[in-house]
Amino acid sequence: MESQSPIESIVFTDSCHPSQQENKFVQLISDQKIAIVPKFTLECGDILYDVPVAFKTWGTLNKEGNNCLLLCHALSGSADAGDWWGPLLGPGRAFDPSHFFIVCLNSLGSPYGSASPVTWNAETHSVYGPEFPLATIRDDVNIHKLILQRLGVKQIAMAVGGSMGGMLVLEWAFDKEFVRSIVPISTSLRHSAWCISWSEAQRQSIYSDPKFNDGYYGIDDQPVSGLGAARMSALLTYRSKCSFERRFARTVPDASRHPYPDRLPTPLTPSNAHWVVHNEGNRNRRERPCRSNGSSPTSESALNSPASSVSSLPSLGASQTTDSSSLNQSSLLRRPANTYFSAQSYLRYQAKKFVSRFDANCYISITKKLDTHDITRGRGSDSPKEVMKDLSLPVLVLGIESDGLFTFDEQVEIAKSFPNATLEKIISAEGHDGFLLEFTQVNSHIQKFQKEHLIDIMSQTNSFERLDSQVNDTNRESVFGEMEDITSW
């Protein structure tokens, strides 16, 4: 009997596969499948065995196997494109399952089902943790192609992705026979020094958390302070100054909707009060202040001093009531200015939400993956235009002028490097995240492009399962994307 080819030996299973036995994050994605690739060699030379790759599909593959629409997710995304790009998915929309067989595959290093630091290493009988090898953008493309071929795909009609997903899309373009058209959004031909520096700053936040322990931590006791700080830093690069000023300015949170988080003990002395203000927002603070010499601002002598009449929490932004009889006039005059604002509240909320759905080692793994991205690497020239001169497939490049992470100039460079590219602008003041928020514009640009270059696919109608009603709900909050009003958190 003839041995199976690598493609034929790939099997499909679900999230209960042994590779996920310690991975709590995989349960966040419903109805996804997991492909198991028996053997896969990474660019770094390491060989992985029984490699899980998570994916979701919508629609039906046609008999020619050429109506595949591939969606590539961003850094913290998952295979559940219905969560982060739901308003674009459905009949009559850009990602129409009545025309396309839509596939979204999870990247290596992500905590959502594909091989990563949180998946099981059969050789060590533990999760990979910090020993998970470096996986590149090209590794993602190579292993994803195996899954698509196993699904019966003969050609990708269109590959679409933003940010990190756009990097995968650009790499897919080099598979000229397999890929018919691409739509890279808010991405780059090579990861810039600016982006590399932001990734480094975020990783250093994680490294500096004492709980990180070189990456050897329990999945239920990860370095949340460091990971949360990294997420805050990243969020600032995903938005714009204009976006934050317009939404927050110097407003303070509504205490009835956003109670003051992690309220500190009521200060009993001026020193204690200063300590409260100074450590507000410090997730690793002590319960009570303790000086380096072992003394405490709340010592008995301090409590008996005249200044101990300062007995209420200094203003931290939310309105508070104070018993005027407990404070003398000079204390009231010295009452400090607000130190807790809506912008801070939003960042802390997002950090808290993120650390409940992501893993620190995975964050490090994926940001290092981004750093490897360079479309010219190993292709004989440092000139993108030179290495891409023979890539004649239709290309739609979408960019955002307010994007400070993947600048509009970089989108212009992408469009100029392809022989057959069109550049369109997404009008948004939201910065980089505009590609996950401006659904109407993104949908319109992609549909116009499809009608021009995929008319044969668009004229076909295939059967498909009814979509979850929540997929197209623009008012629901996304787990992996940006579908939320950032002033209604």
Swiss-Prot record:
<comment type="similarity">
    <text>Belongs to the AB hydrolase superfamily. MetX family.</text>
</comment>
<keyword id="KW-0808">Transferase</keyword>
<dbReference type="InterPro" id="IPR000073">
    <property type="entry name" value="AB_hydrolase_1"/>
</dbReference>
<feature type="compositionally biased region" description="Basic and acidic residues">
    <location>
        <begin position="280"/>
        <end position="290"/>
    </location>
</feature>
<dbReference type="GO" id="GO:0071266">
    <property type="term" value="P:'de novo' L-methionine biosynthetic process"/>
</dbReference>
<dbReference type="GO" id="GO:0004414">
    <property type="term" value="F:homoserine O-acetyltransferase activity"/>
</dbReference>
<feature type="active site">
    <location>
        <position position="403"/>
    </location>
</feature>
<feature type="active site">
    <location>
        <position position="432"/>
    </location>
</feature>
<keyword id="KW-0028">Amino-acid biosynthesis</keyword>
<keyword id="KW-0486">Methionine biosynthesis</keyword>
<dbReference type="GO" id="GO:0005829">
    <property type="term" value="C:cytosol"/>
</dbReference>
<feature type="compositionally biased region" description="Low complexity">
    <location>
        <begin position="299"/>
        <end position="329"/>
    </location>
</feature>
<dbReference type="Pfam" id="PF00561">
    <property type="entry name" value="Abhydrolase_1"/>
</dbReference>
<keyword id="KW-0963">Cytoplasm</keyword>
<dbReference type="InterPro" id="IPR008220">
    <property type="entry name" value="HAT_MetX-like"/>
</dbReference>
<comment type="pathway">
    <text>Amino-acid biosynthesis; L-methionine biosynthesis via de novo pathway; O-acetyl-L-homoserine from L-homoserine: step 1/1.</text>
</comment>
<dbReference type="InterPro" id="IPR029058">
    <property type="entry name" value="AB_hydrolase_fold"/>
</dbReference>
<keyword id="KW-0012">Acyltransferase</keyword>
<dbReference type="GO" id="GO:0009086">
    <property type="term" value="P:methionine biosynthetic process"/>
</dbReference>
<feature type="active site" description="Nucleophile">
    <location>
        <position position="163"/>
    </location>
</feature>
<dbReference type="GO" id="GO:0071265">
    <property type="term" value="P:L-methionine biosynthetic process"/>
</dbReference>
<feature type="domain" description="AB hydrolase-1">
    <location>
        <begin position="69"/>
        <end position="438"/>
    </location>
</feature>
<comment type="function">
    <text>Commits homoserine to the methionine biosynthesis pathway by catalyzing its O-acetylation.</text>
</comment>
<feature type="region of interest" description="Disordered">
    <location>
        <begin position="255"/>
        <end position="329"/>
    </location>
</feature>
<protein>
    <recommendedName>
        <fullName>Homoserine O-acetyltransferase</fullName>
        <ecNumber>2.3.1.31</ecNumber>
    </recommendedName>
</protein>
